[in-house]
Amino acid sequence: MSGCGPWLPHDLLWGMTPAQLPGDAPAWAHAVLEAGQPVVVRRALTAPGQVAVGLRGVSREQRYPALLDLQAVQRGVRPEQLCHVPPQGPWPALQALQHLRDELDAQEWIWGVSGSAGFELASGVAALHQHSDLDLILRTPELLPRARARELLALLDGAGCPVDMQLQVPGGALALREWAGPAARVLLKSASGARLVSDPWNPQEQAA
């Protein structure tokens, strides 16, 4: 994909240059852009013509928020485009992905790979290690029954590696693990912030 999107959280975008960084950006942020690495779309309100992104460095502490001009985007990759990219490493997160792939596909869900695994699969840049979790997203435009969420969580918990799945709903995202749990309200994250809701698919709660 290329052009002006629309881009969604967890999409990876290429085209940002060091010249687009603020003057106080750390040296490592300049280095990753000079190396041609992508940035990841994050949830935040922006002015028209911009998208909120995050840069990632070598260590977990190296994360930097920035704004990217949409016209600078050369191409982008969605998490669901990475489900069947052949893994190139021995890491448990990639082994878990191979274990889960067929079962998730069989449900005819729209799902994808995000986080460190998605970054490595999309860019070829080493981002995983022995103790990395596997981050997944699931597009859920309609209500996912909580009983079904519990079944899905049980599947993920049997993958042999910690798996963190986010449900992408029309008004934001929430953790599958929370929705599968007993709490009456769960944390819904949106571009305008986070709030506790009882029904993440209810537009009235999203706007409250």
UniProtKB/Swiss-Prot annotation:
The keyword Nucleotidyltransferase applies. Pfam families: MdcG, MdcG_N. Keywords: Nucleotidyltransferase, Transferase. Transfers 2'-(5-triphosphoribosyl)-3'-dephosphocoenzyme-A to the apo-[acyl-carrier-protein] of the malonate decarboxylase to yield holo-[acyl-carrier-protein]. NCBIfam families: malonate_mdcG, PRK01293.1. Belongs to the MdcG family. This is Phosphoribosyl-dephospho-CoA transferase.
